[in-house]
Protein backbone atom coordinates (compact mmCIF):
# COMPACT_ATOMS: atom_id res chain seq x y z
CA UNK A 1 0.00 0.00 0.00
CA UNK A 2 2.96 2.33 0.44
CA UNK A 3 3.55 2.13 -3.33
CA UNK A 4 0.15 3.61 -4.12
CA UNK A 5 0.26 6.51 -6.56
CA UNK A 6 -0.39 10.03 -5.34
CA UNK A 7 -3.57 11.89 -6.32
CA UNK A 8 -1.54 13.99 -8.75
CA UNK A 9 -0.83 10.84 -10.77
CA UNK A 10 -4.52 10.23 -11.34
CA UNK A 11 -5.86 10.65 -14.88
CA UNK A 12 -7.61 13.86 -15.89
CA UNK A 13 -10.82 12.13 -16.89
CA UNK A 14 -12.18 9.01 -15.25
CA UNK A 15 -13.42 6.28 -17.58
CA UNK A 16 -16.02 3.94 -16.06
CA UNK A 17 -15.13 0.31 -16.73
CA UNK A 18 -16.24 -2.95 -15.14
CA UNK A 19 -12.94 -3.10 -13.26
CA UNK A 20 -12.97 0.26 -11.53
CA UNK A 21 -15.26 2.60 -9.61
CA UNK A 22 -14.38 5.96 -11.18
CA UNK A 23 -17.53 8.00 -11.66
CA UNK A 24 -16.44 11.61 -12.11
CA UNK A 25 -13.21 13.53 -12.58
CA UNK A 26 -10.48 11.68 -10.72
CA UNK A 27 -8.12 14.53 -9.96
CA UNK A 28 -8.55 16.49 -6.74
CA UNK A 29 -10.09 19.82 -7.61
CA UNK A 30 -11.41 22.89 -5.89
CA UNK A 31 -14.72 22.12 -4.27
CA UNK A 32 -14.10 18.35 -4.01
CA UNK A 33 -12.14 16.13 -1.62
CA UNK A 34 -10.30 12.83 -1.83
CA UNK A 35 -11.39 9.73 0.04
CA UNK A 36 -8.74 7.90 2.05
CA UNK A 37 -9.62 4.53 0.48
CA UNK A 38 -7.86 2.75 -2.35
CA UNK A 39 -9.27 0.15 -4.70
CA UNK A 40 -7.64 -2.62 -6.67
CA UNK A 41 -8.54 -2.52 -10.37
CA UNK A 42 -7.92 -4.89 -13.24
CA UNK A 43 -8.28 -3.03 -16.52
CA UNK A 44 -5.71 -4.76 -18.78
CA UNK A 45 -4.96 -7.91 -16.86
CA UNK A 46 -2.49 -6.08 -14.62
CA UNK A 47 -3.28 -5.23 -11.04
CA UNK A 48 -2.97 -1.56 -10.07
CA UNK A 49 -4.24 0.64 -7.27
CA UNK A 50 -6.32 3.73 -7.83
CA UNK A 51 -7.65 6.20 -5.35
CA UNK A 52 -11.46 6.53 -5.08
CA UNK A 53 -12.68 10.14 -5.39
CA UNK A 54 -14.94 11.27 -2.55
CA UNK A 55 -18.38 12.26 -3.87
CA UNK A 56 -18.84 14.87 -1.15
CA UNK A 57 -18.39 18.53 -2.03
CA UNK A 58 -17.15 21.35 0.11
CA UNK A 59 -19.95 23.74 0.91
CA UNK A 60 -20.93 26.98 2.57
CA UNK A 61 -24.07 28.69 3.82
CA UNK A 62 -22.94 31.99 2.28
CA UNK A 63 -25.19 33.06 -0.60
CA UNK A 64 -23.28 34.66 -3.53
CA UNK A 65 -24.22 38.20 -4.42
CA UNK A 66 -24.64 37.27 -8.07
CA UNK A 67 -25.58 34.19 -10.04
CA UNK A 68 -22.81 32.22 -11.66
CA UNK A 69 -21.85 33.52 -15.13
CA UNK A 70 -24.30 32.40 -17.79
CA UNK A 71 -26.98 31.38 -15.30
CA UNK A 72 -29.99 33.03 -13.74
CA UNK A 73 -33.75 33.09 -14.09
CA UNK A 74 -34.65 31.61 -17.51
CA UNK A 75 -37.53 32.81 -19.73
CA UNK A 76 -40.72 30.75 -19.88
CA UNK A 77 -42.49 29.93 -23.18
CA UNK A 78 -45.53 32.15 -23.77
CA UNK A 79 -47.88 29.20 -24.35
CA UNK A 80 -47.03 27.81 -20.92
CA UNK A 81 -47.68 31.21 -19.34
CA UNK A 82 -51.08 31.35 -21.05
CA UNK A 83 -51.97 27.85 -19.83
CA UNK A 84 -51.11 28.81 -16.23
CA UNK A 85 -53.20 31.99 -16.51
CA UNK A 86 -56.13 30.07 -18.03
CA UNK A 87 -56.17 27.52 -15.20
CA UNK A 88 -55.85 30.30 -12.64
CA UNK A 89 -58.76 32.18 -14.22
CA UNK A 90 -61.00 29.08 -14.24
CA UNK A 91 -60.18 28.28 -10.60
CA UNK A 92 -60.33 31.84 -9.20
CA UNK A 93 -63.56 32.85 -10.96
CA UNK A 94 -65.13 29.39 -10.53
CA UNK A 95 -65.83 29.12 -14.26
CA UNK A 96 -67.93 26.14 -15.29
CA UNK A 97 -66.54 24.79 -18.57
CA UNK A 98 -69.05 22.82 -20.72
CA UNK A 99 -67.95 19.24 -21.34
CA UNK A 100 -67.67 19.54 -25.18
CA UNK A 101 -65.41 22.57 -24.84
CA UNK A 102 -63.35 20.85 -22.13
CA UNK A 103 -62.87 17.73 -24.27
CA UNK A 104 -61.99 19.78 -27.35
CA UNK A 105 -59.52 21.92 -25.41
CA UNK A 106 -58.01 18.83 -23.80
CA UNK A 107 -57.47 17.25 -27.22
CA UNK A 108 -55.82 20.43 -28.53
CA UNK A 109 -53.40 20.39 -25.59
CA UNK A 110 -52.74 16.69 -25.03
CA UNK A 111 -52.25 15.54 -28.64
CA UNK A 112 -49.32 17.93 -29.41
CA UNK A 113 -48.02 17.35 -25.88
CA UNK A 114 -47.98 13.61 -26.51
CA UNK A 115 -45.77 13.85 -29.60
CA UNK A 116 -43.45 16.42 -28.03
CA UNK A 117 -43.04 14.33 -24.89
CA UNK A 118 -41.90 11.34 -26.93
CA UNK A 119 -38.98 13.45 -28.15
CA UNK A 120 -38.10 15.22 -24.90
CA UNK A 121 -39.59 15.01 -21.38
CA UNK A 122 -39.54 18.75 -20.62
CA UNK A 123 -43.01 19.56 -22.13
CA UNK A 124 -44.70 16.88 -20.00
CA UNK A 125 -42.85 18.07 -16.89
CA UNK A 126 -43.89 21.67 -17.56
CA UNK A 127 -47.52 20.60 -17.98
CA UNK A 128 -47.35 18.75 -14.67
CA UNK A 129 -45.85 21.77 -12.90
CA UNK A 130 -48.59 24.05 -14.19
CA UNK A 131 -51.39 21.64 -13.34
CA UNK A 132 -50.43 20.33 -9.86
CA UNK A 133 -52.05 23.18 -7.84
CA UNK A 134 -55.32 22.85 -9.79
CA UNK A 135 -55.63 19.05 -9.54
CA UNK A 136 -58.75 19.44 -7.38
CA UNK A 137 -60.26 22.73 -8.60
CA UNK A 138 -59.92 21.75 -12.29
CA UNK A 139 -59.92 17.97 -12.05
CA UNK A 140 -60.85 17.41 -15.70
CA UNK A 141 -62.92 14.25 -15.60
CA UNK A 142 -62.27 12.85 -19.09
CA UNK A 143 -65.53 11.12 -19.86
CA UNK A 144 -66.14 9.16 -16.67
CA UNK A 145 -66.00 5.83 -18.51
CA UNK A 146 -62.78 4.84 -16.74
CA UNK A 147 -62.53 5.35 -12.97
CA UNK A 148 -59.78 7.79 -12.05
CA UNK A 149 -59.17 9.05 -15.61
CA UNK A 150 -58.61 12.79 -15.25
CA UNK A 151 -56.01 15.42 -16.08
CA UNK A 152 -53.65 14.23 -13.33
CA UNK A 153 -53.69 10.65 -14.59
CA UNK A 154 -53.37 11.75 -18.23
CA UNK A 155 -50.30 13.92 -17.56
CA UNK A 156 -48.72 11.19 -15.43
CA UNK A 157 -49.21 8.71 -18.28
CA UNK A 158 -47.55 11.16 -20.67
CA UNK A 159 -44.60 11.41 -18.28
CA UNK A 160 -44.29 7.62 -18.07
CA UNK A 161 -44.44 7.30 -21.88
CA UNK A 162 -41.79 9.99 -22.17
CA UNK A 163 -39.63 8.16 -19.63
CA UNK A 164 -39.94 4.94 -21.63
CA UNK A 165 -39.03 6.64 -24.91
CA UNK A 166 -36.14 8.63 -23.47
CA UNK A 167 -34.67 5.67 -21.56
CA UNK A 168 -34.26 3.71 -24.81
CA UNK A 169 -32.53 6.62 -26.52
CA UNK A 170 -30.45 8.50 -23.93
CA UNK A 171 -27.99 7.38 -21.29
CA UNK A 172 -29.23 7.89 -17.72
CA UNK A 173 -27.78 10.62 -15.52
CA UNK A 174 -25.43 9.38 -12.82
CA UNK A 175 -27.14 8.96 -9.45
CA UNK A 176 -25.20 9.79 -6.30
CA UNK A 177 -25.63 7.66 -3.17
CA UNK A 178 -27.62 10.39 -1.39
CA UNK A 179 -30.28 10.53 -4.10
CA UNK A 180 -30.42 6.75 -4.35
CA UNK A 181 -30.88 6.39 -0.58
CA UNK A 182 -33.65 8.98 -0.56
CA UNK A 183 -35.44 7.17 -3.40
CA UNK A 184 -35.27 3.93 -1.43
CA UNK A 185 -36.73 5.63 1.63
CA UNK A 186 -39.66 7.00 -0.37
CA UNK A 187 -40.25 3.55 -1.89
CA UNK A 188 -40.26 2.00 1.59
CA UNK A 189 -42.89 4.46 2.81
CA UNK A 190 -45.03 3.79 -0.29
CA UNK A 191 -44.81 0.03 0.30
CA UNK A 192 -45.88 0.47 3.92
CA UNK A 193 -48.80 2.57 2.67
CA UNK A 194 -49.77 -0.25 0.31
CA UNK A 195 -49.77 -2.72 3.22
CA UNK A 196 -52.15 -0.41 5.07
CA UNK A 197 -54.52 -0.28 2.09
CA UNK A 198 -54.43 -4.09 1.80
CA UNK A 199 -55.06 -4.35 5.54
CA UNK A 200 -58.14 -2.16 5.16
CA UNK A 201 -59.35 -4.10 2.13
CA UNK A 202 -59.09 -7.39 4.06
CA UNK A 203 -60.55 -6.22 7.37
CA UNK A 204 -63.35 -3.95 6.09
CA UNK A 205 -66.35 -5.07 4.08
CA UNK A 206 -66.91 -1.54 2.78
CA UNK A 207 -63.74 -1.60 0.69
CA UNK A 208 -63.43 -3.48 -2.60
CA UNK A 209 -60.25 -4.08 -4.60
CA UNK A 210 -61.11 -1.40 -7.19
CA UNK A 211 -61.99 1.30 -4.65
CA UNK A 212 -58.88 0.40 -2.63
CA UNK A 213 -56.72 0.70 -5.75
CA UNK A 214 -58.20 4.10 -6.66
CA UNK A 215 -57.76 5.39 -3.10
CA UNK A 216 -54.17 4.16 -2.98
CA UNK A 217 -53.42 5.79 -6.34
CA UNK A 218 -54.68 9.13 -5.00
CA UNK A 219 -52.57 8.68 -1.87
CA UNK A 220 -49.60 7.80 -4.08
CA UNK A 221 -49.92 10.76 -6.49
CA UNK A 222 -47.53 13.15 -4.64
CA UNK A 223 -44.86 10.45 -4.46
CA UNK A 224 -45.30 9.69 -8.16
CA UNK A 225 -44.51 13.35 -8.83
CA UNK A 226 -41.18 12.85 -7.07
CA UNK A 227 -40.27 9.77 -9.11
CA UNK A 228 -41.36 11.37 -12.40
CA UNK A 229 -39.06 14.36 -11.87
CA UNK A 230 -36.29 12.27 -10.34
CA UNK A 231 -36.03 9.95 -13.36
CA UNK A 232 -36.88 12.36 -16.21
CA UNK A 233 -34.94 15.50 -15.25
CA UNK A 234 -31.32 15.52 -16.41
CA UNK A 235 -30.00 18.97 -17.27
CA UNK A 236 -29.52 21.92 -14.99
CA UNK A 237 -31.09 24.25 -17.57
CA UNK A 238 -34.34 22.26 -17.49
CA UNK A 239 -34.27 22.31 -13.70
CA UNK A 240 -34.00 26.11 -13.67
CA UNK A 241 -36.87 26.44 -16.12
CA UNK A 242 -39.15 24.13 -14.10
CA UNK A 243 -38.46 25.88 -10.80
CA UNK A 244 -39.03 29.29 -12.40
CA UNK A 245 -42.31 28.05 -13.89
CA UNK A 246 -43.32 26.83 -10.45
CA UNK A 247 -42.69 30.27 -8.95
CA UNK A 248 -44.65 32.01 -11.69
CA UNK A 249 -47.57 29.58 -11.22
CA UNK A 250 -47.57 30.48 -7.53
CA UNK A 251 -47.76 34.14 -8.53
CA UNK A 252 -50.87 33.43 -10.64
CA UNK A 253 -52.48 31.70 -7.65
CA UNK A 254 -51.56 34.58 -5.37
CA UNK A 255 -53.06 37.13 -7.76
CA UNK A 256 -56.24 35.06 -7.98
CA UNK A 257 -56.63 35.39 -4.22
CA UNK A 258 -57.57 39.06 -4.61
CA UNK A 259 -60.65 38.06 -6.61
CA UNK A 260 -61.67 35.54 -3.94
CA UNK A 261 -61.15 38.24 -1.31
CA UNK A 262 -63.47 40.55 -3.26
CA UNK A 263 -66.17 37.85 -3.45
CA UNK A 264 -65.88 36.97 0.24
CA UNK A 265 -66.00 40.67 1.11
CA UNK A 266 -69.51 40.85 -0.36
CA UNK A 267 -70.78 38.32 2.20
CA UNK A 268 -72.57 39.52 5.32
CA UNK A 269 -70.24 37.52 7.57
CA UNK A 270 -66.66 36.31 7.48
CA UNK A 271 -66.19 33.30 5.21
CA UNK A 272 -63.04 31.19 5.41
CA UNK A 273 -61.25 31.03 2.08
CA UNK A 274 -61.12 27.52 0.62
CA UNK A 275 -59.34 28.39 -2.63
CA UNK A 276 -58.05 25.87 -5.11
CA UNK A 277 -57.72 23.25 -2.34
CA UNK A 278 -61.48 23.59 -1.64
CA UNK A 279 -60.73 23.28 2.08
CA UNK A 280 -59.61 26.15 4.30
CA UNK A 281 -56.93 24.40 6.36
CA UNK A 282 -55.34 22.74 3.33
CA UNK A 283 -55.35 26.04 1.47
CA UNK A 284 -53.66 27.66 4.46
CA UNK A 285 -50.98 24.96 4.38
CA UNK A 286 -50.45 25.61 0.66
CA UNK A 287 -49.89 29.32 1.23
CA UNK A 288 -47.68 28.70 4.26
CA UNK A 289 -45.45 26.21 2.46
CA UNK A 290 -44.92 27.99 -0.82
CA UNK A 291 -44.60 31.54 0.41
CA UNK A 292 -41.00 30.51 1.08
CA UNK A 293 -40.40 29.71 -2.60
CA UNK A 294 -41.86 33.04 -3.68
CA UNK A 295 -39.71 34.91 -1.16
CA UNK A 296 -36.64 33.05 -2.41
CA UNK A 297 -37.43 34.11 -5.99
CA UNK A 298 -38.07 37.68 -4.94
CA UNK A 299 -34.42 37.79 -3.82
CA UNK A 300 -33.10 36.50 -7.15
CA UNK A 301 -30.71 38.57 -9.21
CA UNK A 302 -31.65 39.22 -12.82
CA UNK A 303 -35.34 38.65 -12.22
CA UNK A 304 -36.40 41.71 -14.17
CA UNK A 305 -38.66 44.58 -13.10
CA UNK A 306 -41.83 43.14 -14.63
CA UNK A 307 -41.43 39.74 -13.00
CA UNK A 308 -40.51 41.29 -9.67
CA UNK A 309 -43.59 43.52 -9.84
CA UNK A 310 -45.96 40.57 -10.37
CA UNK A 311 -44.07 38.52 -7.79
CA UNK A 312 -44.58 41.27 -5.20
CA UNK A 313 -48.36 41.27 -5.70
CA UNK A 314 -48.41 37.47 -5.85
CA UNK A 315 -46.67 37.41 -2.47
CA UNK A 316 -49.16 39.91 -1.09
CA UNK A 317 -52.09 37.89 -2.40
CA UNK A 318 -50.74 34.67 -0.90
CA UNK A 319 -50.21 36.32 2.48
CA UNK A 320 -53.74 37.73 2.34
CA UNK A 321 -55.02 34.28 1.38
CA UNK A 322 -53.30 32.74 4.40
CA UNK A 323 -55.05 35.25 6.67
CA UNK A 324 -58.39 34.57 4.97
CA UNK A 325 -58.16 30.83 5.64
CA UNK A 326 -58.11 31.73 9.36
CA UNK A 327 -55.87 28.72 9.98
CA UNK A 328 -53.90 29.33 13.18
CA UNK A 329 -51.63 26.32 12.75
CA UNK A 330 -50.69 27.33 9.21
CA UNK A 331 -49.98 30.90 10.35
CA UNK A 332 -47.68 29.52 13.05
CA UNK A 333 -45.87 27.30 10.54
CA UNK A 334 -45.41 30.26 8.20
CA UNK A 335 -43.89 32.31 11.04
CA UNK A 336 -41.46 29.53 12.01
CA UNK A 337 -40.45 28.91 8.38
CA UNK A 338 -39.92 32.64 7.83
CA UNK A 339 -37.64 32.87 10.87
CA UNK A 340 -35.65 29.86 9.69
CA UNK A 341 -35.28 31.27 6.16
CA UNK A 342 -34.03 34.66 7.28
CA UNK A 343 -31.89 33.25 10.10
CA UNK A 344 -29.86 31.47 7.41
CA UNK A 345 -30.16 34.23 4.82
CA UNK A 346 -29.38 37.31 6.92
CA UNK A 347 -29.19 37.90 10.67
CA UNK A 348 -30.29 41.51 10.24
CA UNK A 349 -33.36 40.52 8.23
CA UNK A 350 -34.02 37.77 10.79
CA UNK A 351 -34.20 40.33 13.60
CA UNK A 352 -36.51 42.46 11.46
CA UNK A 353 -38.83 39.48 10.84
CA UNK A 354 -38.90 38.63 14.56
CA UNK A 355 -39.81 42.23 15.40
CA UNK A 356 -42.50 42.27 12.70
CA UNK A 357 -44.01 39.01 13.96
CA UNK A 358 -43.99 40.32 17.53
CA UNK A 359 -45.88 43.44 16.45
CA UNK A 360 -48.39 41.29 14.53
CA UNK A 361 -49.00 39.04 17.57
CA UNK A 362 -49.48 41.98 19.92
CA UNK A 363 -51.87 43.64 17.47
CA UNK A 364 -53.65 40.56 16.15
CA UNK A 365 -56.97 42.39 15.95
CA UNK A 366 -55.65 44.39 12.98
CA UNK A 367 -54.68 41.36 10.89
CA UNK A 368 -56.82 41.13 7.73
CA UNK A 369 -59.01 38.27 6.63
CA UNK A 370 -60.43 37.19 9.98
CA UNK A 371 -57.26 35.50 11.29
CA UNK A 372 -56.84 38.09 14.03
CA UNK A 373 -60.38 37.53 15.29
CA UNK A 374 -59.86 33.76 15.32
CA UNK A 375 -56.59 34.09 17.20
CA UNK A 376 -58.28 36.20 19.84
CA UNK A 377 -61.06 33.62 20.22
CA UNK A 378 -58.62 30.77 20.90
CA UNK A 379 -58.69 31.48 24.62
CA UNK A 380 -62.17 32.14 26.02
CA UNK A 381 -62.48 34.20 29.20
CA UNK A 382 -65.69 33.65 31.14
CA UNK A 383 -67.78 36.62 32.23
CA UNK A 384 -66.51 38.07 35.51
CA UNK A 385 -70.10 38.13 36.83
CA UNK A 386 -70.55 34.43 36.07
CA UNK A 387 -70.25 31.75 38.72
CA UNK A 388 -67.70 29.98 36.50
CA UNK A 389 -64.76 32.35 35.92
CA UNK A 390 -62.44 29.79 34.33
CA UNK A 391 -60.38 30.50 31.24
CA UNK A 392 -60.88 27.82 28.59
CA UNK A 393 -59.99 27.09 24.99
CA UNK A 394 -62.53 27.60 22.25
CA UNK A 395 -64.54 24.65 20.92
CA UNK A 396 -62.24 24.10 17.91
CA UNK A 397 -59.11 23.82 20.06
CA UNK A 398 -60.86 21.57 22.61
CA UNK A 399 -62.08 19.32 19.79
CA UNK A 400 -58.54 18.91 18.48
CA UNK A 401 -57.18 18.03 21.90
CA UNK A 402 -59.91 15.41 22.34
CA UNK A 403 -59.18 13.96 18.89
CA UNK A 404 -55.45 13.83 19.64
CA UNK A 405 -56.12 11.95 22.89
CA UNK A 406 -58.37 9.55 20.99
CA UNK A 407 -55.71 9.05 18.30
CA UNK A 408 -53.11 8.29 20.97
CA UNK A 409 -55.42 5.69 22.49
CA UNK A 410 -55.99 4.21 19.03
CA UNK A 411 -52.24 3.87 18.50
CA UNK A 412 -51.86 2.16 21.87
CA UNK A 413 -54.61 -0.28 20.89
CA UNK A 414 -53.17 -1.04 17.41
CA UNK A 415 -49.44 -0.27 17.65
CA UNK A 416 -48.06 -2.39 14.78
CA UNK A 417 -50.45 -2.26 11.82
CA UNK A 418 -52.89 0.44 12.92
CA UNK A 419 -56.61 0.33 12.24
CA UNK A 420 -56.16 0.53 8.46
CA UNK A 421 -56.04 3.21 5.77
CA UNK A 422 -58.98 5.67 5.87
CA UNK A 423 -60.42 3.90 8.94
CA UNK A 424 -59.59 6.64 11.45
CA UNK A 425 -62.83 8.59 11.09
CA UNK A 426 -65.08 5.58 11.52
CA UNK A 427 -63.20 4.44 14.65
CA UNK A 428 -62.24 7.65 16.45
CA UNK A 429 -65.39 8.05 18.56
CA UNK A 430 -64.64 4.77 20.34
CA UNK A 431 -61.33 6.16 21.61
CA UNK A 432 -61.98 9.83 22.46
CA UNK A 433 -62.44 10.64 26.17
CA UNK A 434 -66.07 10.90 27.30
CA UNK A 435 -66.47 13.55 30.00
CA UNK A 436 -68.10 16.91 30.70
CA UNK A 437 -65.54 18.80 28.59
CA UNK A 438 -66.20 16.70 25.48
CA UNK A 439 -69.94 16.19 25.95
CA UNK A 440 -70.92 19.03 23.61
CA UNK A 441 -68.14 18.56 21.04
CA UNK A 442 -68.63 17.03 17.60
CA UNK A 443 -66.27 14.03 17.69
CA UNK A 444 -67.89 11.51 15.35
CA UNK A 445 -66.37 10.86 11.92
CA UNK A 446 -63.67 13.48 12.42
CA UNK A 447 -60.21 13.81 10.93
CA UNK A 448 -57.21 13.52 13.25
CA UNK A 449 -56.03 17.10 12.56
CA UNK A 450 -52.49 15.76 12.98
CA UNK A 451 -50.62 13.88 10.25
CA UNK A 452 -48.28 12.15 12.68
CA UNK A 453 -51.08 10.78 14.83
CA UNK A 454 -53.15 9.87 11.76
CA UNK A 455 -50.34 7.81 10.23
CA UNK A 456 -49.59 6.17 13.57
CA UNK A 457 -53.26 5.32 14.12
CA UNK A 458 -53.99 4.05 10.60
CA UNK A 459 -50.64 2.50 9.65
CA UNK A 460 -48.92 1.71 12.94
CA UNK A 461 -45.86 2.90 14.83
CA UNK A 462 -43.25 1.39 12.41
CA UNK A 463 -44.72 3.38 9.51
CA UNK A 464 -44.89 6.48 11.72
CA UNK A 465 -41.16 6.17 12.50
CA UNK A 466 -40.38 5.84 8.78
CA UNK A 467 -42.54 8.91 8.10
CA UNK A 468 -40.73 11.00 10.71
CA UNK A 469 -37.37 9.92 9.30
CA UNK A 470 -38.64 10.79 5.80
CA UNK A 471 -39.48 14.34 6.93
CA UNK A 472 -36.01 14.64 8.48
CA UNK A 473 -34.42 13.34 5.27
CA UNK A 474 -36.38 15.86 3.19
CA UNK A 475 -34.84 18.64 5.25
CA UNK A 476 -31.39 17.06 5.19
CA UNK A 477 -31.20 16.67 1.40
CA UNK A 478 -32.49 20.22 0.80
CA UNK A 479 -30.02 21.73 3.23
CA UNK A 480 -27.16 19.63 1.84
CA UNK A 481 -27.92 20.82 -1.69
CA UNK A 482 -28.03 24.38 -0.33
CA UNK A 483 -24.66 23.76 1.31
CA UNK A 484 -22.82 22.45 -1.76
CA UNK A 485 -24.27 24.76 -4.41
CA UNK A 486 -22.13 27.72 -5.47
CA UNK A 487 -24.81 29.49 -7.53
CA UNK A 488 -27.13 32.11 -6.04
CA UNK A 489 -30.15 30.79 -7.92
CA UNK A 490 -29.84 27.28 -6.50
CA UNK A 491 -28.77 28.51 -3.08
CA UNK A 492 -32.02 30.45 -2.70
CA UNK A 493 -34.15 27.67 -4.20
CA UNK A 494 -32.66 25.11 -1.80
CA UNK A 495 -33.09 27.43 1.17
CA UNK A 496 -36.70 28.00 0.16
CA UNK A 497 -37.21 24.24 -0.14
CA UNK A 498 -35.69 23.59 3.29
CA UNK A 499 -37.97 26.29 4.74
CA UNK A 500 -40.95 24.65 3.03
CA UNK A 501 -40.05 21.35 4.72
CA UNK A 502 -39.91 23.19 8.06
CA UNK A 503 -43.35 24.64 7.37
CA UNK A 504 -44.72 21.23 6.38
CA UNK A 505 -43.33 19.61 9.54
CA UNK A 506 -45.25 22.17 11.62
CA UNK A 507 -48.49 22.11 9.58
CA UNK A 508 -48.56 18.33 9.99
CA UNK A 509 -49.05 18.90 13.72
CA UNK A 510 -52.33 20.68 13.04
CA UNK A 511 -53.65 18.82 10.01
CA UNK A 512 -53.33 15.81 7.74
CA UNK A 513 -51.64 17.53 4.82
CA UNK A 514 -48.85 15.15 3.83
CA UNK A 515 -50.69 13.08 1.20
CA UNK A 516 -52.39 16.06 -0.45
CA UNK A 517 -51.32 16.52 -4.07
CA UNK A 518 -52.05 20.24 -3.85
CA UNK A 519 -50.16 20.84 -0.60
CA UNK A 520 -47.09 18.65 -1.22
CA UNK A 521 -46.93 18.12 -5.01
CA UNK A 522 -44.62 21.09 -5.62
CA UNK A 523 -42.43 20.13 -2.66
CA UNK A 524 -41.84 16.63 -4.07
CA UNK A 525 -40.96 18.13 -7.46
CA UNK A 526 -38.53 20.53 -5.78
CA UNK A 527 -36.88 17.73 -3.83
CA UNK A 528 -36.39 15.68 -7.00
CA UNK A 529 -34.82 18.70 -8.72
CA UNK A 530 -32.46 19.83 -5.98
CA UNK A 531 -31.23 16.26 -5.41
CA UNK A 532 -29.56 16.68 -8.82
CA UNK A 533 -27.57 19.75 -7.72
CA UNK A 534 -24.54 17.85 -6.30
CA UNK A 535 -24.04 15.88 -9.54
CA UNK A 536 -24.54 19.03 -11.62
CA UNK A 537 -22.03 20.79 -9.39
CA UNK A 538 -19.43 18.04 -9.75
CA UNK A 539 -19.92 17.84 -13.52
CA UNK A 540 -19.46 21.60 -13.71
CA UNK A 541 -16.20 21.40 -11.73
CA UNK A 542 -15.03 18.53 -13.92
CA UNK A 543 -15.70 20.53 -17.10
CA UNK A 544 -13.81 23.52 -15.72
CA UNK A 545 -10.78 21.32 -15.07
CA UNK A 546 -10.83 19.74 -18.51
Where are these regions (language model features)?
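Alpha-helical transmembrane segments of multi-pass inner-membrane proteins
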Residues: 2-6, 33, 37, 46-50, ...
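Short, aromatic-rich membrane-interface segments at the entry and exit
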Residues: 95-106, 119-125, 145-147, 240, ...
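Membrane-embedded alpha-helical segments of multi-pass membrane proteins
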Residues: 98-110, 132-135, 146-166, 216-225, ...
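N-terminal hydrophobic segments of proteins, predominantly signal-anchor/transmembrane helices
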Residues: 112-215
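Short aromatic-rich membrane-water interface segments that cap or initiate transmembrane helices
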Residues: 140, 208-219, 271-284, 450
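A membrane-periplasm/extracellular boundary helix in multi-pass inner-membrane enzymes
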Residues: 264, 320, 324, 345-391, ...
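Long extracytoplasmic/lumenal interhelical loops at the membrane interface
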Residues: 267-274, 387-405, 413, 417-459, ...
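Transmembrane alpha-helices of multi-pass inner-membrane enzymes
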Residues: 338, 470, 495-546
Amino acid sequence: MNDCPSPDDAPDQAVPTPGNRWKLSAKPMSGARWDNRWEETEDTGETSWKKIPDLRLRGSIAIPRENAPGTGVPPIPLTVYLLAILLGFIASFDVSVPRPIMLLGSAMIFIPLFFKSLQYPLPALMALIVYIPYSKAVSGNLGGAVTGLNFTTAIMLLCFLSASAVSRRDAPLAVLPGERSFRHLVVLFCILGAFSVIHTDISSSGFGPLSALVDYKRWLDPFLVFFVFSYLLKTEEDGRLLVTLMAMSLVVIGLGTFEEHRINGMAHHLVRLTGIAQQANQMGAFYSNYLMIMIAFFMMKGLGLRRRFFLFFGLGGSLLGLFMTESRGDALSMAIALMFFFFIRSRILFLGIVALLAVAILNAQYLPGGLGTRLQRTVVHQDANSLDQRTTLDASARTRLALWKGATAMIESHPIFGVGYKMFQSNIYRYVPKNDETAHLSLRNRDAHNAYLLIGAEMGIPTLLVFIYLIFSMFRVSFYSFWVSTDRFWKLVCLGTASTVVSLAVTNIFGSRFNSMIVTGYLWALLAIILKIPIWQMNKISQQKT
